[in-house]
Amino acid sequence: MLIYSFPALAISIPTIPIYIYLPTFYGVTLELGLAATGFALLLARVFDTITDPIVGIISDRFPIKRNYRKPWIAIGSIIAAIGLYQLLNPANDAGIVYLISWSIILYLGWTLVAVPYLTWGAELSTDYNERTSITTTRETAGILGILTCGVIFVLSTNLNSLKWKQSA
């Protein structure tokens, strides 16, 4: 149960940067405007709602090897990592198309991870109570991931205010 739940910790860590930091970063720092940034992120989420059932159907009907959920998760992790990196490290002239494109790529990657991962948890047991325990453990790991990100943010902010320098 713990081994299955561990990826939820890693999957949830980027949620704070994406949902809290990203809108202000693009809207204010990159001067896209908050309304345009919000609309771009809305379009990406609409795309996400379309891809969720499609990925579910594909991952159910086209198993890859014996552990047919894991390869989808691995592929999605790579796609999500690329999308996340690009969103958090944009070029100076990144505009609305850049934000929409890389957000869609990130959400596609997250969908390729989340849909097979959540389904896999339901397939680990036929016992109702055990499936409840599996889900509880997974969701607890997800909350710990979000809290970990919060702690990292607070520590990095505090260390930065103490004039700690990054080594090159």
Q: Language-model segments: which ranges?
A:
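Membrane-embedded alpha-helical bundles of multi-pass transporters/translocases
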Residues: M1-A168
